[in-house]
């Protein structure tokens, strides 16, 4: 045997994957192993219904015959050897947890048998190692045994050794040692069960003893049934009746018959239970009466009013077994239908499902009868003592378990002592303990059906209930009067707006304006004092939830499951109809296109309401959580309104809309999106601190349609002499209102005051100013604005904010888990009337516990846990909605997942029994009260309550809860602050282990303004934040800036540090490290992958080709299916930057490179902050500093070190210096801090003091430094590219490039116009952004200059030759070129997503070369005759693909196509032509595809006329003969604006969006590309042919091929031999201008004809020439040309004054003809660019004049 084999002895087996053996290595010890056969999977044989016989298929379980076969193989064997191949550490029964897979070799009768081969030969297994590994990673190989199965295996091992001759002590010791962990678990489980039984027995014994003591006390009792407030009166002993055991037995029999009473008796019991006195009941101590007569009375009527008015309640006399059943929930507590005297009716059958479903397809189920068992529970009279607090704000982004819960138990005990509630603990504690002990026992679910509704109607008809209804009416009147009193009091205390609290009162506005006069330096005008008129509110009931089922065919239940919930209140009580489809929103075509390019396909829940209300001119107030689409919820609609108002008043200069954002960063982002939405037609202007006043004033005077600014900026503009003209203002928007209300409330009030004054002077009083506000939270600042704004609509998606919006009473209790049920019961007892209550739990066992307790207390309960299916949910939803009772309110007990599906919105009370894991889930719970929240527009008070129960198991959510409580009330226990601080500290400590950096705002400003939504760290720890020894802690430091993160944060490499006159220079080791790493990784053997990355790993990554740098894994973004990390965030150690990478790009880094220091740190400029109370520095400030550094590369930075935290150095001075070596002097060129203070920043003296205080708390010495790793902003990740694809039928294409017939690239004709428009945008972008590409990697998508026409196009870097030269693949041309790195530019996300990459990789199907590869002559002939026609224009070819495979060069597919040339009298299949010309031979496997093309080929009409003026196609008439297949059979009929219902197997959904042409379009294309009848096939010659796209030619030395048939003569075209100069053309409605770009030309010939231009010249020994057929007719007499030196300018006058679609009649398909982008900006009266754009869009469709295409209607909409 080979060296990797070792001998084993088989002990036991279950299947080929589970074999236990003993390794025969030593006679003195026994070594066990768990083995499996590698690479085989089980198969199963089943009967084939289609063909006779058995069908084999893969299975997850081994067939029983496998064990029989293994038994036969293992019998009488001689030796067994094993060779390991794979080790798994997940499923072994032994302590080492090793499960080996390999091959078992059995030596039997002198023959070697391989177990895997025997299993495969027997048809019981199949060999597939790849699938084997996949199944193993997915857990489909079942090797994990249960405890019972493991115990059986160990028993079999012991049985085997009992039969062997080995010593018992030896094998028993080995078995025990190898299975010690399993046996320990068994003992632990046995101990747990034993303790549980002992605990239950102890509880039962104690309960029985207490009950017997109660019975003994009853012997001498003279009490009667007492109610609340009734005094205990002693009675005579003579009247006492002694109860004996016999009487107890009789009473138990009587009680068992109570349930057999009639419905009327049940009704009496029900009403008596709820309305008798104060609901008095007796405890277990008073469960017995004194005589048998009272027992008989109770057994007949169940409860009777005594003479003194108190009610006697039937007592439960239960033996020990019955008591255990009650407390352990083993007996189902539900409503049961009492037995009636009427004959038994037949059982009714029902079907569960939506109303529209076919009932024949669902199984019938017997309709459950309503059962109702009345059980009496002792009443617990508790003092109600709870504080009113609110709960919830934002979601927790850190899921951490708080481990030190013992500390919180002490705090909880202290809270319980302070908050003592006098409850009867014995009953509820025993109930709680019994529920916990039996939480895993199964309990039956509730079955509430329509019978419940029927019985409720019967109860209403009873006379007893009628009398109770009268009592209820009296009670309702009294409660209403009390509610009105409380509402009056609350309205007096609330902050509802009144005329006296007017937001713009004289005194308040005077103070605000005085403040602005002191703070603002610009002169101000005196303003008149006015008051905003009070707006009366209509007191009508408003629409709460606009999402209703409007589709009659859609199930109401399904609508509830899928429809979102949103609170909408309107001032005018108008109906708000949501719009769930993006196409139905009337934004206009241009905005819809931008939204699609941004990836917005559907509106969010908030946007379904906000877009429509804003477009209708209503004032809208949006309250929604972060990242829920608030900004995009108003911005597209506002931009549409701006465009509409601009068209109505084009001469106005003032803004139509003003958007106020809290930060300059938000202003820049809104400005970017607005410019995308509005384009070039509307003027968008952004204003923030630091901008030049002159440029701002100039921009406003030139006209502004949309003004975006910060609050301080808008106030300055309004107070300037040349201020903003508000006369044309129609919309005022406030974004980020949660911060504006805290910091800039006076500024917003001032703007509203100016708007009010403008409205008074406006002529048209009906034209109001629409107000739009977006905020994360509800602020008191919003309330007066909402009430005074015209036609207000409040839309709230953050449901926790509804508590503050409607001022709902909320209480929070922090208590022990065993006291929760008592607290719930106390809250439920306070509920009066038929109002609905929802109790939300976290787990199913909590649902069962609460349900049992409520039913025990005679409540109508609907329980819903995670085990319920769709039928149960539907049934529960129907019964919940149909439940009606004027005296009882139903209670829904459910989990969060069920609550979302049921979509309950009509509750009045909400109880949070336990908190969920996510805070967002907690916030969604508040939506159950959605229909009952009172409107802000009505002065009404509704009895809504929310109760939150907290215990020590939910303390991880306490910090956010506490933050919300402090917003609602001041009565928050201070002890909760201590608890919250400990929790936050422990969470930050857990973040340290995950390398989470300190908050950037905390380090830059000293505070984090958004702590609850920030995911970074906010505490400093000595262990992780102490600085390294080499980091400067004081003195003066010099450094070189590597990267600007912001205006005050930089990545830098240290140069020197001077302390007390001593200068320490840092060694520049980076170059040495880079050289060593380059030499190490230059060897292929050294490039080993890092493996599975973990947070904290240090490895290497390739930044450029053969350029490796060090990095550290700081975060894992995504994982593979097997759980291994895929995408990770890495920190570049030597650059202090963060990037994203994949695990396969990380390489192993030797230890010698890990410890080398390159002295790279982060530097922050301290003690300054942005102007105007901003929290972000603008991009303008950052760009100004970057320009200073870029102008002079010799500059270095110098600053004074104030303190250090981790790898971050804080400097309080920062200067840009220059060394004058000749003078040995250092001069300061720029003072960065002063530059910022002059225009962008203000001093912040508290910055460092706050950080120093945090350092002192953590134990760091303040002056000595502090530590922290600051994370720069990660490099943005570009979206995945999409590639164009061929359609299933014929596709019209251009041939882009050819490598050979097995690799060629085509591009679709239908996207040619879009490509031209995209290229114009790309080149305009590059001209405006001159910063070159900073670094590049192989595979990067960039913008590169195409050498043939010097135009920038999209490209991919395929190879890096050096730092100055790369090889690029142009993704739209399908060609490779060598490009200088100076000609590369960064690409934007829009350029990638705007249009798919156009190069489509193909090969010619059905042919193959004669040799191993294609000859150069064959490739050149193919290129010469398929690229261009006789006139030099690109040929319109057609392809039909038959195969599809993975592409070699692109990211799409590689198609096997047949190429069709229609430029002759008959359509020619180029594949067959190559075979006929002996340039290729047939591929036998694929030649049938060409035969199929021949059979289905359709001959098109030869005649195709061209409209001279319009450039469009005339009608196409089909020839009378030679038509085999009609056009409608070739192309499938597509619906109007159709979208594929099912994606292709290979193509993505994104690519389908570009299938915009229809069969009519292809019909026109066929006719358009029809050549003249005189054109013939050229003869094959050995002349010079064009070899590549660069125009280089080469002579082929091959001989002329013999003709296989009579071939036509070649048409000579000398023009093909001439070089084509680049032509830039432009036009307006009157003229066309051509720029022939040949610099330095002196002599040339140019001839202008009516519809042609011919040019020829010789320059630098190069012959140039062309002849163009123009799109339209020109006036030769008025045309002229001149030599401008750099180019020849040709100006031609059009005969018809209209725009051309292209320069030439065939379209601008030549690469050397481009549109002059410098002339795109036309005058406003001509609007040339806009017309050209619309014409290009129309040209995409290529429809003829007579077409009725639905796309024509679409184009009419565009126009």
From Swiss-Prot:
PANTHER family named among the record's database cross-references: ATP-DEPENDENT RNA HELICASE TDRD12-RELATED (PTHR22655:SF2)
One Pfam family matching this protein: CS
EC number: 3.6.4.13
Protein name per its UniProtKB record: Putative ATP-dependent RNA helicase TDRD12
Domain annotation Helicase C-terminal: ranges: 823-980
Residue ranges constituting the Tudor domain according to the UniProt record: 74-153, 1335-1394
Gene designation per UniProt: TDRD12
Chain intervals with Low complexity compositional bias: 480-495
Subunit structure: Interacts (via Tudor domain 2) with Siwi. Component of the PET complex, at least composed of EXD1, SIWI, TDRD12 and piRNAs.
Keyword Zinc: no
GO terms for cellular component: chromosome; cytosol; nuclear membrane; P granule; PET complex
GO terms for MF: ATP binding; ATP hydrolysis activity; nucleic acid binding; RNA helicase activity
Protein's UniProt keywords contain Cell cycle: no
């Amino acid at each position: 045997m080979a060296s990797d084999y070792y001998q084993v002895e088989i002990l036991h087996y279950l299947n080929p994957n589970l074999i236990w053996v003993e390794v025969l290595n030593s006679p003195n010890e026994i070594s066990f192993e768990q083995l499996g056969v590698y690479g085989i999977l089980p198969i199963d044989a089943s009967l084939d219904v289609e063909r006779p016989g058995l069908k084999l298929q893969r299975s997850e379980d081994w067939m029983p015959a496998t064990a029989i076969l293994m038994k036969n193989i293992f019998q009488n064997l001689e030796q067994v050897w094993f060779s390991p191949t794979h080790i798994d550490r997940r499923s072994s029964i032994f302590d080492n947890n090793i499960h080996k897979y390999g091959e078992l070799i059995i030596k039997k009768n002198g023959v070697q048998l391989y177990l895997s081969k025997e299993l495969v030969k027997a048809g019981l297994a199949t060999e597939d190692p790849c699938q084997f590994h996949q199944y193993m990673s997915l857990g489909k190989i079942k090797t994990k045994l249960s405890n019972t199965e493991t115990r059986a295996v160990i028993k079999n091992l012991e049985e085997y050794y009992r039969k062997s001759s080995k010593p018992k002590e030896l094998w028993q010791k080995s078995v025990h040692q190898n299975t010690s962990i399993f046996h320990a678990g068994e003992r632990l489980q046995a101990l747990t069960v034993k303790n549980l039984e002992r605990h239950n027995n102890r509880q039962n014994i104690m309960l029985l003893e207490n009950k017997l003591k109660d019975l003994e006390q009853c012997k001498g009792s003279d009490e009667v049934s007492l109610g609340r407030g009734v005094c205990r009166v002693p009675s005579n002993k003579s009247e006492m009746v002694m109860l004996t055991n016999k009487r107890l037995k009789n009473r138990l029999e009587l009680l068992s018959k109570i349930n057999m009473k009639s419905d009327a008796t049940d009704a009496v019991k029900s009403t008596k239970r709820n309305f008798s006195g104060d609901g008095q009941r007796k405890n277990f101590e008073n469960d017995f009466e004194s005589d048998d007569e009272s027992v008989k009375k109770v057994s007949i009527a169940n409860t009777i009013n005594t003479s003194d008015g108190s009610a006697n309640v039937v007592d439960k006399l239960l033996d020990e077994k019955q008591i255990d059943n009650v407390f352990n929930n083993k007996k189902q507590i539900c409503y049961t239908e009492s037995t009636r005297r009427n004959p038994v009716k037949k059982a009714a059958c029902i079907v569960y499902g939506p109303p529209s479903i076919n009932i024949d397809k669902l199984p019938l189920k017997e309709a459950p009868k309503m059962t109702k068992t009345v059980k009496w529970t002792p009443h617990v009279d508790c003092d109600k003592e709870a504080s009113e607090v609110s709960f919830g704000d934002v979601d927790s982004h850190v899921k951490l378990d708080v481990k030190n819960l013992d500390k919180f138990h002490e705090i909880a005990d202290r809270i319980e002592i302070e908050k003592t509630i006098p409850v009867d603990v014995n009953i509820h504690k025993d109930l709680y303990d019994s529920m916990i002990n039996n939480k895993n026992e199964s309990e039956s679910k509730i079955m509430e059906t329509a019978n419940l509704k029927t019985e409720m109607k019967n109860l209403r008809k009873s006379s007893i209930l009628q009398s109770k209804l009268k009592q209820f009416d009296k009670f309702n009147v009294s409660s209403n009067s009390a509610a009105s009193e409380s509402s009056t009091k609350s309205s007096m205390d609330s902050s509802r707006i009144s005329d006296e609290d007017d937001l713009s009162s004289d005194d308040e506005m005077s103070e605000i304006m005085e403040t602005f006069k002191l703070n603002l330096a610009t002169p101000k005008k005196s303003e008149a004092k006015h008051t905003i008129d009070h707006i009366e509110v209509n007191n009508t009931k408003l629409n709460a939830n606009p999402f209703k089922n409007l589709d009659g065919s859609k199930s109401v239940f399904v609508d509830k499951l899928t429809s979102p919930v949103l609170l909408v209140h309107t001032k005018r009580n108008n109906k708000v109809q949501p719009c769930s489809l993006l196409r139905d929103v009337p934004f206009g075509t241009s905005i819809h296109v931008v939204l699609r390019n941004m990836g917005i396909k559907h509106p969010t829940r908030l946007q379904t309401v906000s877009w429509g209300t804003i477009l209708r001119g209503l004032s809208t107030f949006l309250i929604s959580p972060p990242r829920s689409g608030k900004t995009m919820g108003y911005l597209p609609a506002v931009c549409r309104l701006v465009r509409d108002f601009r068209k109505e008043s084009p001469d106005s200069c003032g803004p139509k809309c003003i958007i106020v954002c809290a930060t300059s960063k938000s202003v820049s982002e809104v400005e970017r999106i607005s410019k995308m939405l509005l384009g070039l037609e509307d003027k968008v202007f952004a204003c923030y601190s630091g901008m030049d006043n002159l440029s701002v004033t100039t921009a406003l005077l030139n006209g502004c349609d949309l003004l975006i600014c910060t609050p301080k900026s808008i106030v300055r503009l309004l107070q300037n002499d040349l201020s903003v003209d508000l006369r044309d203002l129609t919309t005022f928007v406030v974004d980020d209102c949660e911060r504006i209300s805290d910091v800039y409330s006076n500024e917003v009030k001032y703007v509203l005051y100016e708007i009010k004054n403008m409205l008074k002077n406006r002529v048209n009083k009906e034209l109001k100013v629409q107000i739009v506000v977006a905020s994360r939270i509800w602020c008191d600042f919003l309330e007066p604005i909402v009430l005074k704004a015209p036609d207000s609509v409040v839309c709230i998606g953050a449901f926790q904010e509804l508590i503050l919006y409607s001022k709902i009473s909320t209480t929070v209790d922090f208590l022990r888990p065993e006291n929760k049920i008592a607290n719930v019961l106390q809250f439920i007892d306070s509920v009066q009337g038929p109002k609905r209550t929802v109790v939300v739990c976290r787990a199913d066992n909590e649902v069962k516990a609460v349900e049992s307790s409520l039913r025990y207390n005679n409540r109508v309960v609907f329980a819903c846990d995670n085990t319920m299916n769709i039928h149960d949910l539907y049934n529960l939803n129907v019964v919940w909605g149909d439940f009606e009772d004027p005296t009882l309110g139903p209670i829904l007990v459910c989990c969060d997942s069920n609550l979302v599906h049921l979509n309950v919105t009509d509750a009045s009370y909400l109880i949070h029994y336990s908190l969920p894991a996510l805070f967002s889930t907690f916030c969604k719970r508040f939506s159950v009260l959605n229909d009952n929240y009172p409107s802000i527009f009505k002065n009404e008070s509704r009895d809504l309550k929310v109760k939150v129960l907290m215990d020590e198991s939910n303390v991880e959510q306490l910090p956010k809860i506490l933050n919300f409580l402090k917003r609602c009330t001041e009565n928050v226990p201070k002890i909760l602050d201590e608890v919250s601080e400990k929790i936050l500290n422990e969470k930050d400590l857990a973040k340290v282990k995950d390398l989470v950096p300190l908050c950037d705002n905390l380090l830059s400003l000293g505070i984090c303004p958004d702590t609850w939504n920030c995911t970074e760290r906010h505490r400093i720890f000595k262990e992780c934040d102490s600085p390294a020894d080499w980091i400067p802690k004081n003195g003066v430091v010099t450094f070189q800036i590597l990267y600007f993160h912001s205006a005050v944060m930089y990545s830098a490499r240290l140069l020197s540090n001077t302390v007390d006159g001593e200068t320490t220079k840092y060694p520049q080791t980076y170059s040495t490290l880079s050289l060593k790493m380059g030499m190490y990784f230059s060897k292929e053997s050294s490039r080993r992958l890092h493996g599975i990355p973990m947070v904290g790993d240090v490895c290497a990554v390739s930044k450029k080709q053969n350029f490796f740098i060090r990095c550290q894994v700081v975060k894992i973004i995504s994982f593979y299916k097997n759980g291994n990390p895929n995408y990770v965030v890495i920190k570049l150690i030597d650059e202090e930057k963060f990037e994203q990478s994949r695990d396969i790009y990380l390489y192993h880094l030797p230890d010698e490179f890990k410890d080398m220091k390159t002295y790279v740190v982060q530097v922050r400029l301290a003690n300054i902050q942005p102007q105007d109370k901003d929290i972000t520095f603008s991009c303008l400030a950052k760009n100004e500093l970057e320009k200073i550094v870029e102008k002079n590369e010799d500059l270095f930075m110098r600053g004074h070190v104030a303190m250090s935290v981790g790898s971050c150095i804080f400097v309080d001075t920062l200067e840009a210096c220059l060394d004058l070596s000749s003078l040995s002097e250092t001069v300061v060129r720029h003072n960065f801090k002063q530059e910022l203070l002059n225009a962008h920043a203000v001093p912040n003296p508290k910055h460092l003091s706050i950080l120093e205080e945090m350092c002192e708390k953590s134990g760091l010495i303040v002056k000595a430094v502090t530590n922290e790793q600051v994370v720069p902003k990660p490099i943005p990740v570009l979206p995945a590219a999409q590639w164009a694809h061929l359609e299933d039928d014929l596709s019209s294409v251009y041939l882009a490039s050819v490598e050979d017939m097995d690799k060629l690239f085509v591009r679709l004709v239908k996207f040619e116009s879009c490509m031209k428009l995209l290229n114009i945008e790309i080149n305009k972008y590059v001209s405006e952004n001159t910063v070159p590409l900073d670094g590049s990697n192989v595979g990067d998508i960039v913008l590169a200059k195409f050498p043939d026409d010097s135009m920038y196009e999209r490209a991919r870097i395929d190879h890096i030759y050096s730092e100055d030269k790369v090889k690029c693949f142009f993704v739209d041309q399908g060609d490779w070129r060598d490009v200088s790195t100076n000609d590369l530019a960064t690409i934007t996300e829009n350029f990638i997503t705007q249009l798919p990459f156009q190069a489509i990789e193909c090969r010619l199907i059905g042919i193959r070369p004669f040799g191993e590869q294609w000859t150069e002559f064959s490739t050149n002939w193919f290129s010469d005759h398929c690229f261009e026609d006789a006139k030099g224009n690109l040929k319109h070819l057609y392809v039909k693909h038959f195969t599809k495979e993975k592409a070699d060069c692109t990211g799409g597919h590689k198609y096997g196509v047949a190429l069709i040339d229609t430029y002759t009298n008959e359509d020619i299949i180029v594949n067959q032509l190559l075979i006929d010309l002996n340039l290729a031979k047939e591929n036998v496997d694929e030649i049938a595809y060409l035969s199929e093309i021949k059979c289905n080929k359709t001959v098109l009409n030869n005649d195709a006329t061209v409209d001279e003026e319009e450039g469009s196609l005339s009608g196409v008439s089909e020839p009378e003969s030679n038509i085999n297949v009609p056009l409608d059979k070739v192309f499938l009929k597509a619906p109007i604006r159709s979208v594929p219902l099912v994606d292709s197997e290979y193509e993505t959904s994104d690519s389908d969006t570009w299938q915009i042409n229809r069969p009519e379009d292809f019909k026109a294309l066929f006719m358009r590309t029809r050549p003249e009848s005189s054109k013939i096939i050229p003869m094959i010659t050995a002349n010079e042919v064009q070899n590549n796209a660069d125009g280089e030619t080469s002579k082929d030395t091959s001989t002329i091929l013999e003709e296989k048939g009579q071939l036509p003569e070649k048409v000579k075209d000398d023009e093909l031999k001439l070089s084509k100069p680049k032509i830039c053309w432009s036009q307006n409605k009157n003229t066309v201008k051509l720029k022939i770009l040949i610099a330095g030309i002196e002599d040339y010939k140019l001839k202008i004809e009516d519809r042609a231009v011919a040019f020829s010249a010789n320059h630098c020994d190069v012959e140039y020439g062309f002849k163009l057929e123009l799109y339209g007719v020109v006036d030769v007499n008025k045309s002229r040309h001149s030599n401008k030196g750099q180019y020849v300018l040709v100006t031609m006058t059009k005969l018809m004054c209209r725009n051309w679609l292209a320069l030439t009649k065939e379209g601008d398909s030549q690469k050397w003809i481009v549109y002059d982008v410098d002339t795109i900006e036309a005058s406003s009266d001509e609007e040339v660019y806009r017309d050209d754009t619309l014409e290009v869009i129309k040209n995409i469709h290529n429809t003829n004049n007579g077409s009725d295409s639905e796309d024509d209607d679409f184009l009419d909409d565009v126009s």
